[in-house]
């Protein structure tokens, strides 16, 4: 998995090469904020920041995040201390204060979807990455998040087991 950054113009076009770092684990909130500092230092100045992160995010606060609470990354042992650090963490305020600019923090699939939807009618966006992402829009308005990736499918397994990055690695790129 990776944490990426760039700068966009008002039309949503990249005006800087994307910078990327491999997601380090474990990843408490302060460590993620430090990564944002490092990414911002490598990019041109911006007026505001949008962060998309995995999990349930409500009004910029982390309800839950499936991967950042693990000791060694997705599908590894969960660290109860990290769960507590992330629970109800006001990521939006922390990012705004750290980078000294207005910030919005949403689920990563919602951020991707905002750049892809037409704004007409009911639109559902699915993203495939570390896990399955989902965003739902009605006439361009973002609807409350549905964390599909963690839903049980069968035999106690979740969707991420079957169609996330772990499945891609298991099956291969062309499966």
Regions flagged by a language model, labelled:
Residues 59, 112-116, 133-136, 144-145:
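Short, well-ordered, mixed-charge alpha-helical segments that flank or form enzyme active sites
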Residues 1, 53-54, 107-109, 128-130:
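Fold-independent oxyanion-binding glycine-rich loops
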Residues 1-34, 75-77, 141-169:
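Short glycine-rich, Thr/Ser-proximal phosphate-binding strand/loop in the N-terminal lobe
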Residues 48-50, 123-127, 133:
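Short glycine-aspartate micro-motif
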Residues 3-8, 55, 132-138:
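Short beta-strand scaffold segments in enzyme catalytic cores
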Residues 111-128:
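Short, electropositive alpha-helical surface patch
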Residues 86-109, 141-175:
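Glycine-rich phosphate-binding loop plus the immediately following alpha-helix
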Residues 19, 24, 29-37, 41, ...:
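Glycine-rich phosphate-binding loop and adjoining helix at the ATP-binding site
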